[in-house]
Amino acid sequence: MFVTKIQISSFRNIAAAEIRFDRRFNVLHGANGQGKTSVLEAIYLLGTMKSFRLAKTPDLVSWNTPHALLRGWAERDGVGREIALYLGKEGRKARVDQKPVTRLADFFGNVNAVVFSPEEIAMARSGPDLRRRYLDRAIFSGDLGYLLLHHEYHRLLKQRNALLKRGSREGLDIWTGQLAEAGTRLMVKRMGYLAEIEPLVQRFYREIAGGEEEAGLAYRPHLTTPDLVSREGTDALLALFGAHEAEELRRGTTVVGPHRDDVDFVLNGRVIRTHGSQGQQRSFVLALKMAEIEYLERLNDAPPVLLLDDISSELDPQRNANLMTFLREKRMQVFITTTDVSTLRLAGIATHASFHVSRGTVTPL
């Protein structure tokens, strides 16, 4: 899978750009705040219709312009696709091969993209929000059904919270039941994904760290008390919501559930958030991203497009070398942003394209 060209109009600080990409490595360099990450964000939007920066549609449109337009050309197994995404007051509208897209399923998968950002480097030592967000994004990269389920869960959560905010029990049981059902399916998919990639994380961690430490992933739900753990499926979440109902009515919000769960990154049975060195934490996250790429390649019979957002500055020379060796062997298309080209390990890479980004202007070199 390759992105061969992209056109950007009135997007963030990029007024207009047309960029032709190399099929292997593409390096975008320049000072901070010039538009490098916006190019990666545009590619990601053309694959998922979502921003990896948690931005709302108005945030994506250039100042004093009515809308933004992204167009990309992608190729897989010799078959080309033209993808267009309109971003405006009316929301987001997509076309594939110049035909309007009415179902997300018709848009999803034309560009399979994985993002690796400094935010993810930090998630091993951060609070649960970053790890949960990473997990959700990793799963829906290969499972459209998970994305739809995630939307459904949060729609139900919003409705239930509205009732709780009013302090009303009328109709609460109905929303609680639906939320528990969707939440159970969400948790099952999360735990299933972690079970799939854990052996890959273990393998890549050993290759990076060069030791015998055993890496592991543990989903950490709120179902921690013996009376809840002993229950199965939806009954467990119903019991959890029931146990906290008085508190939730008092606070006006849902305080437990999959939207509050966490994932533990573990080495030799110890959670690295509290017991791991910075080097161990960074090696673990690097192994996790490698596992995500490997998993998607197996799932789709083709590696995804990788978007590396200023990662070279976050990794030491050895881990940078580990990552670049992995990417060379994968034969995948890679987009790299950096403020300092000298930090990249491009030796041995036969072909790559370089671009300088300044004040929203992208210049090929």
UniProtKB/Swiss-Prot annotation:
Its main location: cytoplasm. It is found in: Cytoplasm. InterPro entries: DNA-binding_RecF (IPR001238), DNA-binding_RecF_CS (IPR018078), P-loop_NTPase (IPR027417), RecF/RecN/SMC_N (IPR003395), RecF_2 (IPR042174). Pfam families: SMC_N. ATP binds at residues 30-37. PROSITE patterns: RECF_2. Coiled coil: none annotated. The keyword Cytoplasm applies. GO terms for molecular function: ATP binding; single-stranded DNA binding. Transmembrane segments: none annotated. GO terms for biological process: DNA replication; DNA synthesis involved in DNA repair; double-strand break repair; SOS response. It comes from the Bacteria. SUPFAM superfamilies: P-loop containing nucleoside triphosphate hydrolases. GO terms for cellular component: cytoplasm. Keywords: ATP-binding, Cytoplasm, DNA damage, DNA repair, DNA replication, DNA-binding, Nucleotide-binding, SOS response. The RecF protein is involved in DNA metabolism; it is required for DNA replication and normal SOS inducibility. RecF binds preferentially to single-stranded, linear DNA. It also seems to bind ATP. Belongs to the RecF family. HAMAP family: RecF. This is DNA replication and repair protein RecF. It comes from Geobacter metallireducens (strain ATCC 53774 / DSM 7210 / GS-15).
